[in-house]
From Swiss-Prot:
It is an enzyme of class 2 (transferase). It comes from the Eukaryota. This is 3-beta-hydroxysteroid sulfotransferase. The lineage of its organism: Eukaryota, Metazoa, Chordata, Craniata, Vertebrata. Keywords: Cytoplasm, Lipid metabolism, Steroid metabolism, Transferase.
Amino acid sequence: MSDNTLWFEGIRFPMVGFSPELLREVRDKFLVKDEDTITVTYPKSGTNWLIEIVCLILSKGDPKWVQSVPIWDRSPWIETQHGNELMKSQKDPRIYTSHLPLHLFPKSFFSSKAKVIYCIRNPRDVLVSGYYFTSKMKIAEKPETLQQYMKWFLQGNVIYGSWFEHVRDWLSMREKENFLVLSYEELIKDTRSIVEKICQFLGKRLKPEEIDLVLKYSSFKFMKENEMSNYSLLPNDLTTEGFTFLRKGVVGDWKHHFTVAQAEEFDKIYQEKMAGYPPKLFPWEEC
C-alpha cells in the first residue's frame, strides 16, 4: 500500500481528517463522562445503523433529528478532526462514535461509567464491504482486486488495523456492566429484540409504538433515502463516481464473492486468530 495513509502506534489511518497529534490527544486527554453513550465498531460492521437506532431511541422514535442533522454531527467520530471539534460544543448527555482499537481509546473511559455499545460483524462480510468502500473512497490506496484486499485485511494492513485484534481486545470488556456487545447478524435477524436490549442497557423506557417508529426510521429503506444518513452529503473530493455508502445491508454477501480457495484461506487464519472464544459469541459461526 502507498503512503497516502498515516501510521500511529502500529495502526493505519487515513491522511484526510486525522493526525498523530489528535490521536495522541484523544487517547491521553479526551475526558469521557459518566453520562456518555459511545457506539464503537470496527469499520463496516453496522456503525451507522447502530447510530441511527441509538438516536431514534433517544428521540423516542421521532425522526426530526435524524432527518435534519447529518449522522456524523449527531454522533461525532472523536478521533477525526471534524468530530473532535464538534465534541467541544456537545451538550450532556453526549453520544459519540469511534472505530478506535482499545489501546488507542481515551484512557479516561476505563475509570468512567460511560456506556459503550460494541457491534461486531462476520469479518468475511466486513472484508467484502470494506473492499467496495475502499474502492470508492479517496482515503486509502484502492485495491486492484478482492484478493489483494483480502491479503491486506488478513495482515491487518487496512484502515484501523486488524479486525482480529480489534475484536479480541474490545471483547475483553464484555463482562463489564457498562459494556454491551451486539452483532450485526442479530440486528438483522431480530431487530426489535435488539432495539429493546439497547433500550434496557441505556435505561430508556419506550412504548411499543415508539419502538415501532425506531424500527421504521432506522430501516435500510429509510436510511438509504435519508440524505442525513446515507452519506450523499460527503464532499466530492472524498468519493469517486458511483459511491454508495449503504450498499446492501445483508448477511452472508461474502459467499457471492469468495472463491473456495479464498474461503479456506480465510477460515484457516480465522480459526488461528479466534481460538479459545466460545462460538456463541459469534452468531455467524452458527450459520
